[in-house]
Amino acid sequence: MQAMQLNTMRLGLLLIFVLVLSGCAVKLISSYDEKTDNAITALQKEMTQFFLTVEAQAGLPECKYSNHTQFYQQAKIALSAISVRVKAIEANELTIEQVDLLQDSLISLEQLHQLGCLTPNQVTNLRSNFDSSITAILKLELAKKRGKPLL
């Protein structure tokens, strides 16, 4: 009889344990990272400055790639630092993917610029694309900060 009561008690405790565990939230994404947020925001400012400068230089000799190599070097360094940071954070795959895509976009921008000066129309489209990519990264970080679901 006591063995039966002991088994019933164990089953009850197991059931309570399972119910408690099922009520726990499973975290599948990293927490908000203020340094990533700040670094991405700083990069966005640098990108905007670059696009405004290149747009103002359209048709002038100053628009050439060779006059903007320092920007590309600094942007690559900034993105590399951001990439290293986001890869060091556990459960941060979405942010890693977005930063990788942003790095690819920067490489493509540089290759396009090496072919010749960017036209005002190209600058408008490129700036919009970079703003969208950066906004997506910031939205994800801010959603992490609020603890809200991403969907």
Q: What kind of feature is each model-predicted range?
A:
Residues 19-23:
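C-terminal motif of bacterial Sec signal peptides marking the signal peptidase cleavage site
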Residues 31-55:
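Post-signal peptide N-terminal segment of mature Sec-exported envelope proteins
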Residues 86-113:
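Heptad-repeat alpha-helical coiled-coil/4-helix-bundle sensor or tether segments in soluble regions
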Residues 1-13:
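Bacterial N-terminal signal peptides that target proteins for export
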Residues 62-73, 95-100, 121-128:
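Short, charged, amphipathic alpha-helical segments
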Residues 105-151:
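C-terminal amphipathic alpha-helix
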Residues 52-91:
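Alpha-helical segments in soluble extracytoplasmic regions
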Residues 25-28:
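Bacterial signal peptide processing site
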